[in-house]
Amino acid sequence: MRNQIKWLWDNMDLRYRRRHVIALCISVFTCLLLLVNPALSRRLIDDVIVAQNPDPLLGILMVMLATKLGREGLRYLMVIFLETDSQNVIYNLRRRLFEKLQYSDMRFFDVHRTGDLMTRMSADLDWCRHFLSYISYRILDAVCTFLFAAVYLTTVNWKLTLLLIVITPVLLVITKVFSKSVRPRFVFMREKLSEMNTAAQENIAGNRVVKAFAREEYEKRRFEEKNRAFMDSHLRINKVWLTFFPMIELLVNAIQLVTVFVGGLFIIRGALTPGELAIFTGLSWAVSNPWRELGNLINDLQRFSTSASKVMEVYYAKPGIKDAPDAVSHERMRGRIEFDHVSFRIDGKPILTDVSFAVQPGQTVAVMGPTGGGKTTLISLLARFYDVTEGAVRVDDCDVRQWKLQQLRGGIGTATQDVFLFSDTVEGNVAFGDQDLTLDEVKDFTRRADASEFVEKLPEGYDTIIGERGVGLSGGQRQRIALARALAVRPSILVMDDTTSAVDSETERYIQDQLRNLPFECTRFIIAQRISSMRDADLILVLRDGRIAEQGTHGELLKKRGYYWQTYCLQYGIPMKEAV
């Protein structure tokens, strides 16, 4: 708990710290003001009612009214400070967390689910805000109210005060037991919330797949399981709280009744005045109410602690992929690619083994092979989404680990089969990598990707907002917009991972012609299964089980009569025994 509070405090700007301290000081002062009216009620009873002297009545009532109004005004100011400052603190925290996510490496996103990260950015951060705006001052308020009331009542009659607070040690023990038992339940509940949000997020993102397989009922059952597990985790916490709260309430009410009874005996014996007993009845709630609130405050504290811990995991996560201290700046990427005895393993499992090849600037390298052979991993290593386990990947004769990440990735334009388009206009999606593009340049790149014809037929043309992931467009249309986006950055290395898998042969030929006549020179890195997409490449690699099984030009690989030749025969309908 201490670490979470310290982390939150450290992330508050100095002005918000000051305002928060001022708000808490106001809270302490308003707790002192709580003593005024009970003290005046003593005079009202003893000096006015019992003495039958109406002269002080108006003055006492005016002071009581002024105290009440002043206290409410101060508390209003306090709440304004706490609410506005907490919102600003969380705004800055959310901004910093989002920045952390931008520079986290791919391994981080491999481990953390989208729904879980969304929960940390929203619900968990909101509990941090709730701590600043409510929990912190309510704890201080409860402690100060109890202490001030106890001290003041001691000056009135220490024996009766002792009777009123005698159950404090018992309440402290009950509170400690409750706090220990509820903490793991909150951690469990937080995990169930994350699982439920992940299930909802995946269902919404994959709604087309759900409908395509008619799995609506299955998804309903799956979400129902997550939803019920979350509800059950809540109920377990409530069960603990419902056991704790009645015990507190019973003890507090019992001691209040005993206090009134004993106070009455003191009056009969002349050891206490009616006005002094009025003070005890008026302030007994100030001594007992903090214990009543304790259950809710412990609940809130445990939720805050659990949520803040989840946020801190993201906040303190260190990216494994970052600029080296001696990273080199380059004026312009030329596009030479070299894989030098590269091996790559994830959790000990080999993905690539001893891969070596080189491509000169302006050349085209194509990679094919069975699914799971490691083709896409080559791209990930080239853009340094991951670091090699052995060997080196070089761009322009410089190890990619010595490149500045922004320069390295800024020189690579990537278009993949699994297209992600933003909920933005067509123009905004194409110009995503270069916000300075003019509309004419956007149109030129969409034309080269053979996307201009269908884009111009959209309701608002290039200003048409396309849905998340390109909802409303066909697979081939999404791929062509993604290709236009990759071309628009004028990359030195153009990566195409099955980019034309969803387009027809005529469109593919048009795109290939356009790529051969780009207004800038670039090295093309193509991953494909179609022979037609790679037959003109300067170097073709066949990757099987993470190793290069074959390499050469189209003609050379046909002569080897290996995997490439077999694929060629199958795709062109040539019986292998007749193929030359």
Predicted regions and their residues:
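Alpha-helical transmembrane segments of multi-pass membrane proteins
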Residues: 67-86, 133, 137-144, 165-191, ...
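An intracellular "coupling" helix at the cytosolic face of ABC transporter transmembrane type-1 domains
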Residues: 10-15, 82, 106-107, 123-132, ...
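ABC-type nucleotide-binding domain
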Residues: 323, 330-580
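Membrane-integrated ABC transporters
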Residues: 1-36, 41, 49-62, 70, ...
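Helix-loop-helix
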Residues: 53-59, 152-166, 236-309, 314-315
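Transmembrane helices of ABC transporter permease
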Residues: 15, 19-32, 63-67, 134-188, ...
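Juxtamembrane helix-loop junctions of ABC transporter transmembrane domains
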Residues: 25-26, 33-49, 54, 58, ...
